[in-house]
Amino acid sequence: MARFQTVTKHARFVYSPYSATEMQGFAQVLADSIRARIQGGQNIYDQAAAPLKPGQSGRRGYPDYKSARGLKPIRDWTWSGHTLRCLKVLTANENRAAIGFLDEALSGRRQTASQIAAFNNRREAQWGVSPRDRQAVLVAFQARPFVMLKAA
């Protein structure tokens, strides 16, 4: 399987003081922050996500199956890890960068990572930018040296 490469384009009109590679870096900071938050079992409001539903009438439920595999029984989008591994910076140019899920299906499955993410996000809003994610990107923006030019 070929490794994914972010598509870096150059815009015809540039409104931003950042290069395409800098925008890709900022988007990667955001993607890493979102991935860490989802793996921590938090929603887009930086609160604990709703608990998983237990089994009914003496049957084992999804939390029981996750515990049996050695995983945390919380809503963290991890079973095989494929969905969160597909969270990438898809495109970047001087004006904007887009993050999302690759349209790859794990072998033996019908649904792609983006379909699984959309389905999981309908249950509990975890895919999106939380206040802590926004703060992480602002720190990355402010860490970049800013140069002001004065008119003579």
Which sequence ranges carry the predicted segments?
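Short, Lys/Arg-rich flexible segments
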Residues: M1-A152
